[in-house]
C-alpha cells in the first residue's frame, strides 16, 4: 500500500488508476482506503481469499502447511499441484499454453520468499469483513472483479460490492482466480 503511494509520488504522478489481483487486489483496496487523493479509480480483482469467518481458521492452517511445503519440497514440486488447483481449472482448459507458462513461472519463484509471504502477509492480513467501517466511507470509484469459479473470493467480493458506496461488481463466467490471464481482452 505504501509502496504504491511512494512510487506515484517519486514519479510525480498526481493520481492514477490502480489495478491489483489477489494479494495485489488487497493492496489496491488498502491503497484506496489510505490514499484516496492519489487514486483516480481502483480495480480490485480476486480479493478476499481467507476472509470468510467460518473458513478463517482453516485458511490460516492451510497457509502454514503451504509455507512448510515451500520450504521442504521446494517451489518446483509445490507448483505442480498449486498451479493445477481448483481455481485454475478454467485457465488450463481455455489456454493450455498460457497455463503451462504460468505454472513454469510459478515454479521459478523463491521457495523462501513464498513461505515468508504465506506466513507474514497472507496468513496475517485481516479479513475484508473486518474493514467494513472503513469501506463504507470509501470514495474512490472501485470495480470489483472476480471469476465465478473463484469460490473463496465470491462472498468477500459480493460483500465489497455491497459495502463500498462507489463499487461496481464484474463477475466473469467460467473464470477462476487468475482472471487477468484467463480473460486478458476484458
Residue spans for each PLM region:
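Conserved acidic catalytic loop of the alpha/beta-hydrolase fold
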Residues: 1-16
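Conserved alpha/beta-hydrolase "acid-adjacent" motif
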Residues: 151-156
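Conserved alpha/beta-hydrolase catalytic His-Asp/Glu region
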Residues: 54-58, 72-134
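Short beta-strand/loop motif that positions the catalytic acidic residue
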Residues: 138, 144-146
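Flexible "cap/lid" loop of the alpha/beta hydrolase fold
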Residues: 29-34, 38-73, 77
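Gly/Ala-rich beta-loop-alpha elbow adjacent to hydrolase catalytic centers
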Residues: 20, 24, 28
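Short beta-strand immediately N-terminal to the catalytic nucleophile in serine-hydrolase-like folds
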Residues: 18-20, 45
Amino acid at each position: 500500500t505504501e509502496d504504491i503511494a511512494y512510487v506515484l509520488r517519486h514519479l510525480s504522478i498526481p493520481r492514477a488508476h490502480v489495478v491489483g489481483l489477489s494479494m495485489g487486489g488487497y493492496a489496491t483496496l488498502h491503497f484506496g482506503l489510505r490514499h484516496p487523493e492519489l487514486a483516480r479509480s481502483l480495480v480490485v480483482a480476486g480479493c478476499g481469499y481467507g476472509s470468510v469467518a467460518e473458513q478463517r481458521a482453516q485458511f490460516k492452517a492451510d497457509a502454514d502447511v503451504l509455507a512448510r511445503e515451500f520450504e521442504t519440497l521446494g517451489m518446483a514440486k509445490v507448483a505442480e499441484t498449486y498451479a493445477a488447483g481448483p481455481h485454475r481449472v478454467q485457465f488450463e482448459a481455455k489456454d493450455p499454453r498460457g497455463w503451462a507458462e504460468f505454472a513454469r513461472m510459478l515454479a521459478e519463484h523463491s521457495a523462501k520468499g513464498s513461505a515468508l509471504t504465506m506466513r507474514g502477509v497472507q496468513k496475517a492480513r485481516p479479513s475484508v469483513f473486518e474493514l467494513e467501517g472503513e469501506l463504507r466511507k470509501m470514495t474512490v470509484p472501485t470495480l470489483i472483479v472476480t471469476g465465478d469459479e473463484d469460490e473463496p473470493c465470491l462472498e468477500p467480493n459480493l460483500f465489497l460490492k455491497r459495502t463500498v458506496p462507489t463499487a461496481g461488481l464484474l463477475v466473469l463466467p467460467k473464470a477462476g482466480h487468475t482472471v487477468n490471464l484467463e480473460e486478458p481482452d476484458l
